[in-house]
Amino acid sequence: MSEKEIWEKVLKIAQEKLSAVSYSTFLKDTELYTIKDGEAIVLSSIPFNANWLNQQYAEIIQAILFDVVGYEVKPHFITTEELANYSNNETATPKETTKPSTETTEDNHVLGREQFNAHNTFDTFVIGPGNRFPHAASLAVAEAPAKAYNPLFIYGGVGLGKTHLMHAIGHHVLDNNPDAKVIYTSSEKFTNEFIKSIRDNEGEAFRERYRNIDVLLIDDIQFIQNKVQTQEEFFYTFNELHQNNKQIVISSDRPPKEIAQLEDRLRSRFEWGLIVDITPPDYETRMAILQKKIEEEKLDIPPEALNYIANQIQSNIRELEGALTRLLAYSQLLGKPITTELTAEALKDIIQAPKSKKITIQDIQKIVGQYYNVRIEDFSAKKRTKSIAYPRQIAMYLSRELTDFSLPKIGEEFGGRDHTTVIHAHEKISKDLKEDPIFKQEVENLEKEIRNV
């Protein structure tokens, strides 16, 4: 594949994974220049964007590149101005990109500091009420791996600092013991490497890589749900590490009990240690994050502009810092000083229609479960008692009405049920709604509550 073909595929996948605002602001207009020596050089026309992409999106792009090209490639975003200083004799003409040798691929399986964002340390982590406990637990684990909490399970929404804490643990462990073998990976990458090891008959090398280490940091574990072989492999990896007193840190967007299609034996192991959750930052924490950012970047931004951002962007840290980056780029491109008015103008696309949060099936299960006194895990169970089966059908109905997920995907989130079960549930609830006005009001109230999540 040429660079252009590779990057088109990367952008297509990234568009599905990132918010519309993040994608259009930072990634949409980038261009893959070359892939060389395990590094992808990607061009961005705006300096702030290149810096932001390197800090916040390098990991997700690296995982996507692995999916597209089938081997490890580390993305590096540079500006078109920096391209002149890029020391290679290549031209920008698209050419065929070839897979590196096995030696090169193995060399990219680093166990050291290269895996971690240099910025993501404990010193740069802004502590507030929503993350104080996860921060303390992470520091305890980093100070004494496998002696404090093992495993440490961190969960919370997107962009709240889970990955920052995992990188901080990695940095701190290596500061204390430079010879420690530390792996940071995502469950998606773990799955891809596992599949590749089966395909290439390299299962022993895969197991050696993941089991002969001191610390395993694995992000977004929820993505192994419904992957039976991957779960089995991770189960044995977990056991091997835990029995040998090696530290395991896991992150997810939800607690273990809410991960559908997760084997009970894995779920119980995730609950062996300490489970901590990160919640969205309050106003004071948001202001502290912005102030720390402008101090680090040596920027001059009026307090009233920061106040405007902190008041308007409340969902997560990534969007908060993204808004600041967008403002800086907007000011630079227009050649105007930053004021509250310019800030409002720069962020109007984000703030005006902040868009209702995208509804997830987990949101629906949580609210329906609370209303009918059904545990979230029961939606995925095989139980058919009416007290569980009927709320499950209501949740399936609402999942089809309020989300864009396919029938098979909805069935998967309800214990791997067939798409015909979802169709039947939708038809039954639709019929009951027409016949029972009280029930109709009940479901409408549930729908309103879900939309307001």
Swiss-Prot record:
Transmembrane segments: none annotated. Residues 332-453 are annotated as: Domain IV, binds dsDNA. ATP binds at G159, G161, K162, T163. Residues 115-331 are annotated as: Domain III, AAA+ region. Keywords: ATP-binding, Cytoplasm, DNA replication, DNA-binding, Lipid-binding, Nucleotide-binding. Domain I is involved in oligomerization and binding regulators, domain II is flexibile and of varying length in different bacteria, domain III forms the AAA+ region, while domain IV binds dsDNA. Plays an essential role in the initiation and regulation of chromosomal replication. ATP-DnaA binds to the origin of replication (oriC) to initiate formation of the DNA replication initiation complex once per cell cycle. Binds the DnaA box (a 9 base pair repeat at the origin) and separates the double-stranded (ds)DNA. Forms a right-handed helical filament on oriC DNA; dsDNA binds to the exterior of the filament while single-stranded (ss)DNA is stabiized in the filament's interior. Belongs to the DnaA family. This is Chromosomal replication initiator protein DnaA. It comes from Staphylococcus aureus (strain bovine RF122 / ET3-1). The lineage of its organism: Bacteria, Bacillati, Bacillota, Bacilli, Bacillales.
